[in-house]
């Protein structure tokens, strides 16, 4: 049996559309844990009315919004404890629409490729000729970013390794989760999937993209409900936390020149072009990382390296992407052409 976890938070219309196609999967041996994450009462009532009599669905009602991380963790913990024969757990955002072979192809790919994290082919719901993402890649300046975002879907038709997946449509092996742990609850909503993907990679687990596991994603539909300055700041804090928690010292030292150059240039650009929002956010993020979050980061780092053996620094360095080409494109798009970032929409 494959458990599929779907979280709903005041997104009834999206959730009903998601569930309609999810329940038509060709892979028959699955069960949906549909979690209402403290929505308004009308959402929960409607979900119960639609799915209480469906043997493939269990509805879990949280009295408050636990966020993405804790909302999923509570169910993952229960599955790992009570379903010892389960090999994989799938996570699916409620703002998605999957093809009927989605789950079957994820499971088949995991077994064929001996992978512990399998990323879906996530396509932009509103522009289905363009990709949302194929999983994650890591820049040598700390960021873990979506790979393939905005590119033509026909460019991504082969399996390849990545640095973990977007948790909006993914498959995790329970063997891996029992060893490396579940989502780090330092996170609330955002970047928790990047951290667990990097954690898995650093500990030698295989993460891949599966092009036949196709999902249409209403990009950022859920995040738009909570996006504000504090959310943007927390994402940047999450980037620093993840990097300094999981990277071996040798990797940190080798990447240091690129890291310092990149952020010096980012500060300079934000000053010259008077991008006050990002200037304030980055200043706050560096201050809080150095003076408020430092002890937490160092303790998380100590616990991680005391309890796990990482792959070699050389292997990690080979998995990184050099930052400059990506950031030049980002500079042209958001500064020169003045297109709004995801955080300004």
Placement of each model-derived feature along the sequence:
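Non-catalytic, C-terminal membrane-associated alpha-helical segments of glycosyltransferases
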Residues: 252-345
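A conserved acidic beta->alpha catalytic loop
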Residues: 12, 21, 36-46, 64, ...
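Conserved donor NDP-sugar-binding/catalytic core segment of glycosyltransferases
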Residues: 96-139
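Glycine-rich, basic loop-to-helix element that forms the pyrophosphate-binding segment
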Residues: 61-82
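A short, conserved alpha-helix in the catalytic core of glycosyltransferases
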Residues: 163-216
């Amino acid at each position: 049996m494959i458990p599929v976890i779907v979280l709903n938070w005041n997104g009834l219309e999206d959730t009903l559309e998601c569930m309609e196609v999810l329940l038509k999967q060709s892979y028959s041996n699955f069960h949906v844990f549909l979690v209402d994450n403290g929505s308004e009462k009308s959402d929960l009532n409607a979900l119960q009315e639609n799915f209480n009599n469906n043997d493939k669905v269990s509805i879990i009602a949280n009295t408050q919004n636990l966020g993405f991380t804790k909302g999923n963790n509570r169910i993952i913990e229960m599955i790992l404890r009570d379903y010892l024969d389960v090999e994989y757990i799938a996570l699916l955002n409620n703002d998605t629409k999957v093809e009927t072979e989605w789950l079957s192809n994820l499971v088949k790919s995991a077994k064929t490729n001996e992978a512990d994290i399998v990323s879906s082919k996530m396509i932009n719901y509103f522009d289905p000729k363009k990709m949302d993402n194929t999983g994650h890649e890591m820049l040598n300046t700390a960021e873990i970013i979506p790979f393939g975002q905005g590119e033509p879907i026909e460019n991504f038709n082969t399996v390849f390794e990545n640095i973990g997946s977007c948790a909006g449509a993914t498959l995790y092996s329970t063997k891996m989760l029992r060893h490396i742990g579940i989502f780090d609850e330092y996170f609330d909503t955002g970047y928790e999937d990047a951290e667990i993907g990097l954690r898995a990679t650093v500990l030698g687990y295989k993460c891949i993209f599966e092009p036949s596991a196709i999902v249409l994603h209403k990009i950022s539909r859920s995040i738009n409900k909570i996006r504000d300055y504090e959310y943007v700041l927390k994402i940047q804090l999450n980037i620093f936390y993840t990097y300094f928690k999981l990277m071996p010292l040798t990797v940190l030292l080798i990447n240091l020149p690129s890291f310092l150059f990149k952020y010096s240039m980012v500060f300079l650009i934000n000053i010259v072009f008077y991008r006050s929002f990002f200037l304030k956010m980055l200043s706050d993020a560096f201050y809080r990382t150095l003076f408020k979050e430092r002890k937490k980061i160092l303790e998380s780092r100590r616990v991680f390296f005391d309890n796990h053996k990482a792959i070699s620094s050389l292997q990690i360095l080979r998995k990184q992407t050099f930052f400059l080409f990506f950031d030049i494109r980002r500079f042209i798009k958001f500064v020169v052409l003045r297109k709004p970032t995801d955080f300004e929409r």
